[in-house]
């Protein structure tokens, strides 16, 4: 054993001060795997092509030897390419539900803008009614009648 921290600390240092909910959600979003844990539990045998003890996700065992995903060299049919919203698809941009969803977002932004405008008007009205004082702390005549 060497002196100092563990190997995991050297590979992935922890920054407790900068960990926020935003970084947590980003980390959770980009570290999720395709296979669900419940699906792996039901198909978790060498015959079913599931993960074995000592086998990493990429098919390598913990000692670096390549292990087949399924018996006979057949690829696992459960493993699918799931690209979600990252795949560019021009046909989806003009579809009905997506356009409606965008219109809903635009309507929400318009409502927010209307609220912002009313807040600005209130602020303007309040500032117009403020009385001016001179240096001797006497209230001067209001400029607005």
From Swiss-Prot:
Tissue note: At the mRNA level, predominantly expressed in the brain. At the protein level, mainly expressed in muscle tissues. In skeletal muscles, expressed in cranial and facial muscles, muscles of the neck, back, thoracic wall, and thigh. Also found in the contractile myoepithelial cell layer of salivary glands.
Location of the region described as Interaction with CAMK2A in the Swiss-Prot/TrEMBL record: 3-35
Biased composition (Polar residues): 87-105
Pfam families: BAALC_N (PF06989)
Record PTM text: Palmitoylation and myristoylation target the protein to the lipid rafts.
Location(s), subcellular: Cytoplasm; Synapse, Synaptosome; Membrane raft; Postsynaptic density
Record's keyword annotation contains Lipoprotein: yes
Stretches of the chain forming a coiled coil according to its record: none
Region (Disordered) residue spans: 36-56, 87-109
Residues with lipid group (S-palmitoyl cysteine): 3
Keyword terms of this UniProt record: Cytoplasm, Lipoprotein, Membrane, Myristate, Palmitate, Synapse, Synaptosome
Function: May play a synaptic role at the postsynaptic lipid rafts possibly through interaction with CAMK2A.
Protein name (database record): Brain and acute leukemia cytoplasmic protein
Native source species: Mus musculus
